[in-house]
Curated annotation (Swiss-Prot):
InterPro entries: DUF5595 (IPR040967), Kinetochore_Ndc80 (IPR005550), Ndc80_CH (IPR055260), Ndc80_sf (IPR038273). Residues 361-547 are annotated as: Interaction with PSMC2 and SMC1A. Acts as a component of the essential kinetochore-associated NDC80 complex, which is required for chromosome segregation and spindle checkpoint activity. Required for kinetochore integrity and the organization of stable microtubule binding sites in the outer plate of the kinetochore. The NDC80 complex synergistically enhances the affinity of the SKA1 complex for microtubules and may allow the NDC80 complex to track depolymerizing microtubules. Plays a role in chromosome congression and is essential for the end-on attachment of the kinetochores to spindle microtubules. This is Kinetochore protein NDC80 homolog. Component of the NDC80 complex, which consists of NDC80/HEC1, CDCA1, SPBC24 and SPBC25. The NDC80 complex is formed by two subcomplexes composed of NDC80/HEC1-CDCA1 and SPBC24-SPBC25. Each subcomplex is formed by parallel interactions through the coiled-coil domains of individual subunits. Formation of a tetrameric complex is mediated by interactions between the C-terminal regions of both subunits of the NDC80/HEC1-CDCA1 subcomplex and the N-terminal regions of both subunits of the SPBC24-SPBC25 complex. Residues 251-618 are annotated as: Interaction with NEK2 and ZWINT. The modification N6-acetyllysine is found at residues 53, 59, 527.
Amino acid sequence: MKRSSVSTCGAGRLSMQELRTLDLNKPGLYTPQTKERSTFGKLSTHKPTSERKVSIFGKRTSGHGSRNSQLGIFSSSEKIKDPRPLNDKAFIQQCIRQLYEFLTENGYVYSVSMKSLQAPSTKEFLKIFAFLYGFLCPSYELPGTKCEEEVPRIFKALGYPFTLSKSSMYTVGAPHTWPHIVAALVWLIDCIKIDTAMKESSPLFDDGQLWGEETEDGIKHNKLFLEYTKKCYEKFMTGADSFEEEDAELQAKLKDLYKVDASKLESLEAENKALNEQIARLEEEREREPNRLMSLKKLKASLQADVQNYKAYMSNLESHLAVLKQKSNSLDEEIGRVEQECETVKQENTRLQSIVDNQKYSVADIERINHEKNELQQTINKLTKDLEAEQQQMWNEELKYARGKEAIEAQLAEYHKLARKLKLIPKGAENSKGYDFEIKFNPEAGANCLVKYRTQVYAPLKELLNESEEEINKALNKKRHLEDTLEQLNTMKTESKNTVRMLKEEIQKLDDLHQQAVKEAEEKDKKSASELESLEKHKHLLESGVNDGLSEAMDELDAVQREYQLTVKTTTEERRKVENNLQRLLEMVATHVGSLEKHLEEENAKADREYEEFMSEDLLENIREMAEKYKRNAAQLKAPDK
């Protein structure tokens, strides 16, 4: 098997399972990553973009060793747009609500609310991040320093597709920073949920199981294929580029697994060839008509729209037909009723015609009958008027009777109310004394229905009135006696008040004298206390002055002693330095004097020699040579000037 897969290594791989190679040539197994992704909700065109370097053929590492890829290494720069609507306040509030619900449901120990999550501090954000990342790495603890570098690094290691800058960690709750960070936290929550679901789900293969469940795209997880891929990958990492042995082993295992019959291979190859030809033909048709699917989809959509229109038209026709049927039924009923009325009228006309044909009266009899009919009608009208007058009079009498009845009932109600207030009714009341003072009005008994209550109620009431008057007189006498007693008590009270007022005046005078004495005593005490306090202050001042003078003298003495010691030390050091310098100076002077004496002796000897040589030479000749030399030098100096 030749290498035909390209592996892209992402940072921070969490799974410890074997790496799976992707065959980009197989349709359905690879999903191309386009720039417009809908992973995080609605797309938004106004989003911040971030650039990052994406290595397509990067350096691969493995637990069994590493090797250099023969495909070469290159990188490309692509802009990844954040499709999440981070400028949408509703979306940000939804993210904050998801974060708040996850924290409260999973036992976040610190206090948190929707209001605090609108603009949290950096410290609160670090607590939330440490709590969330603890689900993926339980032993993780945030470092004490450089958290602004640690958090973006962890997100990058987890494969977060967007960049969190280091500066954003300093201003977490800022309006321009918090939407990006809360979206990253929601992404981390999604990772936690996926990790939890993967941990709770059953393993891909049980012992002895060769095939997994079929997924939505029709792929079956084959344990043999995974083992084959693992072996090829390990061999590939050691430097191999062909895998004939593994191919042969896999082919043998697959034949054993599917129980392949060699005799049927030719028929299968023919069938495979036919299918390949059919695939080629379909691909050619697709190339000839690249937009056939779109046209078919449009045709299907138009046909579906026509079907919907026809269905709506049929429903309208059915409703219209139902209305027409209802109208037809009502018209049929109306026609039947009119026919019955017409038949009835015809029968009545026939009956009346037969009566007219069979009657035996003449015209004079008919006129007489009509005259009698008119007289009877006048009599009926007169009696009707009399009846109406009598009915009106009866109505007036009934109204008068009703008003009288209402007045009597109102008086009886007032009487019963007053009797209940006086505790006369019912019969066993406190003041009834065994009499029944209740009056029952029954108009149907006639005009004398209330006469019996005159003897039943009047005499006991009279007796009660007399007793009440006697009690009232007794109470008045008692009241007058009590008023006299009250007047005497008021007189005594007035005298007592006068006595009390005099005593209060005496007490006030004594209180004033007592207050004056107390004030004088307090003034004396205050004066004594102030004198004592001044003496105490003077004493403290004297003591503090003596102590301060003593401490100052001691401090001065210590300072003088320290200064003396420092001066002695400095003087000793300077004396030693001066002696050393003086000794070196004397040595240098002696050396210099010796060298000068030697130099002077040499100069004297040289001068003697030059004097002797000078005396032996011709002085005039030397002067002439010097003059000529001077003239030549002067001529040379004048030549450049010209």
